[in-house]
Regions:
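C-terminal-of-GTPase-core extension/linker across diverse P-loop GTPases
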Residues: 1-170
């Protein structure tokens, strides 16, 4: 299997796109090849090409590459992202509305990264602080509590769960 993979890689392909059965995939995974890692492409576009990125010839090339690898492309405009970073919540929302987009490229990139890696965040809140914790999707509440402190996992009693959108609506 490694011989076939070597030929595949020498032809300029990534290990991610190498077709094989589950047993061979498990063997190949032991090599810990960088090109086996999941990938997201961030396409930096200028302000003019950002609104209609699918008509941009360079973006199409990146899309085709990503499609061959089963990857996702996130269009971003670094100049707009820099402007967005300087704005507060209400100004940011108005700016994004004027651009006709719901989220900044950075927010979309973060969400896509979390999804690709199978991660979610949960929030804890107390009198002094509110904090976000990153865990694997599907982690049970006691194990999530253990991320904060191992004593919390051992003495876990219950979790009070609120949907993020419901929390933001308050």
């Amino acid at each position: 299997v490694f011989s076939a993979l070597k030929d595949w890689l020498n032809d300029g392909n990534s290990a991610r796109s190498f077709a094989c059965d589950e047993d061979d995939a498990a063997i190949i995974a032991t090599a810990e090849l960088l090109s086996l890692k999941p990938i997201i492409y961030a396409a930096n576009l200028d302000e003019d090409g950002f609104a209609d990125c699918h008509s941009n010839a360079y973006y199409k090339i990146v899309e085709e590459l990503a499609a061959r690898e089963g990857a996702q492309v996130i269009p971003v405009c670094a100049k707009l992202e820099a402007e967005i970073a300087e704005l507060d919540g209400d100004e940011k929302k108005m700016f994004l509305d004027d651009l006709g987009i719901a989220q900044s490229g950075l927010d979309r990139l973060i969400q896509a990264s979390y999804a690709l890696l199978g991660l979610i965040s949960f929030l804890t809140s107390g009198e002094d602080e509110c904090r976000a914790w990153t865990i694997k999707k599907g982690t049970k509440a006691p194990q999530a509590a253990g991320k904060i402190h191992t004593d919390f996992e051992r003495g876990f009693i219950r979790a009070e769960v609120v949907n993020f959108d419901d929390l933001m609506a308050c």
